[in-house]
């Protein structure tokens, strides 16, 4: 008699995905972040569901309802702070996951990579509309500034902005539809994550050496279930430390003031995880140019499979590419810092140089480094 997990139509799917899945024996802790992202998504959906039970998406009561959650609902403060800081945790895992994909050449699995880019865009959209919901000062002005960027699109721009706003400014209609988007998008993300996994299991996982490991595989369970569980424990430990001791560390103090269309905050900026893109947007003194640069800063990831010139997949044995990779990471940290600074010298020129370097490394320097390394291998 066959084991139930191998014969039952439903359990069979789970078995092939998480139990008997053949996995390379040498994948490092950096491969944990896929499962950690799954954990983050579940955490966000659950906490978000409980918040939605008490939240009201009306401009007059939204801010008060969030205050009510924190003050009057049982453990409401905990749920609210877990949800708010859970977004930061999500993006930390997301950025490490992408960085690992770039470092080890995982982008050569084109379908998996492209679905991943779509997931990134959807996650960014979800985080953006979610940030508007508390209806604080930064929520309101962030929504106004970012949605207004669409007006840079020739011919249809202004109509598009008014269509998204549901009127002639960010108001009740905008808040209601943003709440609807924020509720539905995570479920679309969950469905796409399944597609992401489906494409990954078609090819099998990559590994740190970037070589074919078909002849040497081990089952996912118990080896990697235990390893993933360790990652979950460590991440939850750090997460709960942040939530319980420093809940407002990553937030903006301006968002504790109710939205006021007549009073602009001194410095409008998004959450920390969007600052690098915001710095790239601001580095071009032209509205349309800035919007194009902003979109390209993420969309450029789709070009990576076509810009891969090296004979080796992974950067493990490629010192030139490694150096450029770490310069790119440093550049992103620099852009994140610049995004949080006011638009004044010397920050303007630093932001412009960092933005140029970002595109230069990905589009020109990394492919050249790959070609040089190919030559060095022949010597």
Curated annotation (Swiss-Prot):
Query: What residues does heme b b562 bind to?
Result: 83, 182
Mark the transmembrane ranges.
Answer: 33-53, 77-98, 113-133, 178-198, 226-246, 288-308, 320-340, 347-367
- CC cofactor: heme b
Specify the signal sequence span.
none
Q: Which GO terms describe its cellular component?
A: mitochondrial inner membrane; respiratory chain complex III
> Where in the cell?
Mitochondrion inner membrane
Please list the GO terms describing molecular function: metal ion binding; ubiquinol-cytochrome-c reductase activity
Cofactor binding note from Swiss-Prot or TrEMBL = Binds 2 heme b groups non-covalently.
Q: Which InterPro entries match?
A: Cyt_b/b6_C, Cyt_b/b6_C_sf, Cyt_b/b6_N, Cytb/b6-like_sf, Cytochrome_b, Cytochrome_b_C_euk/bac, Cytochrome_b_N_euk/bac, Di-haem_cyt_TM
A Pfam match is: Cytochrome_B
Sorted keywords for this record are: Electron transport, Heme, Iron, Membrane, Metal-binding, Mitochondrion, Mitochondrion inner membrane, Respiratory chain, Transmembrane, Transmembrane helix, Transport, Ubiquinone
Q: How does it sit in the membrane?
A: Multi-pass membrane protein
Q: Which SUPFAM superfamilies match?
A: a domain/subunit of cytochrome bc1 complex (Ubiquinol-cytochrome c reductase), Transmembrane di-heme cytochromes
Give me the residues that bind heme b b566, please. 97, 196
Superkingdom of the source species: Eukaryota
Q: Which residues bind a ubiquinone?
A: 201
Q: Which biological processes are named by the entry's GO terms?
A: mitochondrial electron transport, ubiquinol to cytochrome c
Q: Which family does it belong to?
A: Belongs to the cytochrome b family.
Q: What does this protein do?
A: Component of the ubiquinol-cytochrome c reductase complex (complex III or cytochrome b-c1 complex) that is part of the mitochondrial respiratory chain. The b-c1 complex mediates electron transfer from ubiquinol to cytochrome c. Contributes to the generation of a proton gradient across the mitochondrial membrane that is then used for ATP synthesis.
**The protein's assembly and partners:** The cytochrome bc1 complex contains 11 subunits: 3 respiratory subunits (MT-CYB, CYC1 and UQCRFS1), 2 core proteins (UQCRC1 and UQCRC2) and 6 low-molecular weight proteins (UQCRH/QCR6, UQCRB/QCR7, UQCRQ/QCR8, UQCR10/QCR9, UQCR11/QCR10 and a cleavage product of UQCRFS1). This cytochrome bc1 complex then forms a dimer.
Something else known: Heme 1 (or BL or b562) is low-potential and absorbs at about 562 nm, and heme 2 (or BH or b566) is high-potential and absorbs at about 566 nm.
Name of this chain's protein: Cytochrome b
Q: Which organism is it from?
A: Thomomys talpoides (Northern pocket gopher)
Q: What is the lineage of its organism?
A: Eukaryota, Metazoa, Chordata, Craniata, Vertebrata
Gene assigned in the entry:
MT-CYB
């Amino acid at each position: 008699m066959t084991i139930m997990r191998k014969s039952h139509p439903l359990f069979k799917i789970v078995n092939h995905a998480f139990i008997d899945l053949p996995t390379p024996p040498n994948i490092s802790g950096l491969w944990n972040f896929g499962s950690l992202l799954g954990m983050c998504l579940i955490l966000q959906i659950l906490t978000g569901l409980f918040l939605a039970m008490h939240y009201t998406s009306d401009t007059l009561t939204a801010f008060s309802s969030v205050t009510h959650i924190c003050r009057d609902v049982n453990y409401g403060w905990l749920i609210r702070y877990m949800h708010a800081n859970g977004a930061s945790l999500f993006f930390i895992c997301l950025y490490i996951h992408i960085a690992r994909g770039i470092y080890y050449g995982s982008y050569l699995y084109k379908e998996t990579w492209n679905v991943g880019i779509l997931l990134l865009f959807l996650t960014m959209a979800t985080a953006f509309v979610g940030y508007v919901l508390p209806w604080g000062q930064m929520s309101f002005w962030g929504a106004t500034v970012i949605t207004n960027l669409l007006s840079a699109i020739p011919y249809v721009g202004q109509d598009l902005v008014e269509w998204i706003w549901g009127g002639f400014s960010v108001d009740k209609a905008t808040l209601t539809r943003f709440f609807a988007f924020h509720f539905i998008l995570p479920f679309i993300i969950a469905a796409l994550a399944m597609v992401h996994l489906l494409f990954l299991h078609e090819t099998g996982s990559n590994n740190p050496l970037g070589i074919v490991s078909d002849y040497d595989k081990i089952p996912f369970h118990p080896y990697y279930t235990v390893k993933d569980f360790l990652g979950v424990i460590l991440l939850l430990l750090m997460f709960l430390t942040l939530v319980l001791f420093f809940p407002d560390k990553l937030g903006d103090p301006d968002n504790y003031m109710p939205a006021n269309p007549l009073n602009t905050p001194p410095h409008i900026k998004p959450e920390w995880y969007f600052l690098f893109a915001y710095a790239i947007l601001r580095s071009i003194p032209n509205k349309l140019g800035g919007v194009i640069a902003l979109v390209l800063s993420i969309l450029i990831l789709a070009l990576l499979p076509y810009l891969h010139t090296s004979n080796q997949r992974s950067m493990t044995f490629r010192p030139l590419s490694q150096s450029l990779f770490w310069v790119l990471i440093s550049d992103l940290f620099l852009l994140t810092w610049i995004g949080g600074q006011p638009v004044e010298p010397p920050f303007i020129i630093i932001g412009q140089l960092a933005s140029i370097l970002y595109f230069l490394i990905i589009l020109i320097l990394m492919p050249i480094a790959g070609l040089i390394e190919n030559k060095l291998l022949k010597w």
